[in-house]
Amino acid sequence: MFAQARDRLQSGQVVRDYVALTKPRIVILLLITGFAAMWVAAGGPPPLGLTVVTMIGLALSCGAANAINMWYDRDIDAVMARTRRRPLPAGRLTPEQALRFGVITGALSFLVLLTVNLLTALLATAGLLFYVLVYTMWLKRSTVHNIVIGGAAGAAPPLVGWAAVTGRLDWAAVIMFLVVFLWTPPHFWALALFRSEDYERAGVPMLPVVRGERATKWQILLYSLLLIPSAALLYWTGTVGRLYLWTSVVLGCAMVSASVGLLRERAPQMDWAHRTYGWSLLYLFVIFLAMMLDVTRA
């Protein structure tokens, strides 16, 4: 009986480790942007069956990208305090298991999304490959611009969601992509500010490590400013109304305000770095929620 209980506990841990490979919190955030794009493209709630299939396929694609990322980054994950307890550096899964899981999950995502339409499947796969081949295997360890260029992968879900409903890409989808693309650097640079010692130890050339805190804070402010007009552009596509417009402006101004507070903060204080990081998460959630609410009112 005790052996059976132990086996069940071990099986449960293995399942949790495979789920951890997908970085579920990140996947949920990406699914929110993809679902919001579907909602806006449909002018309201999209068909239930289409939504379920698209969300499953997109979740598989994002999870596969994250799993292969963990496989490739297992050496630096073992060095960083934030990541050393992940399944691979902790020795709970082997590299072969992680890679096999990522490849199979990625292939399944393509097959699932192919039942929606070819464009949707290709866009999700392009995002996966860009994240793995361009960001993870090239940019992350070689350039200070890693997160700027690599952010294109994380901005792909709105394109996937839009294509699932319409079978094409429109300017509204491109603007949603742009919002996530511009949001990504200040979000991750805020994290990098209070994790800079980790990144330096691992040899990852994040902006605070290479250029210093002051330069990073100015870049966060710059991208936060760019978010305001970029997010507002969606209003002029006619897909959302003034509720969204003013919400995006208020959220953008709050993001800028947090960035100014961050700029004024002096080391070793990191209160505003944590606040900016947390606010950026709220910003992305609320702005995509505003898109959905306003298109419902239209």
Curated annotation (Swiss-Prot):
Biological process annotations from GO: heme O biosynthetic process
Record carries keyword Transcription: no
Compartments, as annotated in UniProt: Cell membrane
Primary location: membrane
Catalytic activity: heme b + (2E,6E)-farnesyl diphosphate + H2O = Fe(II)-heme o + diphosphate
Transmembrane segments: 26-46, 48-68, 110-130, 147-167, 174-194, 220-240, 243-263, 276-296
Function text: Converts heme B (protoheme IX) to heme O by substitution of the vinyl group on carbon 2 of heme B porphyrin ring with a hydroxyethyl farnesyl side group.
Name under which the protein is recorded: Protoheme IX farnesyltransferase
Organism: Symbiobacterium thermophilum (strain DSM 24528 / JCM 14929 / IAM 14863 / T)
Gene label: ctaB
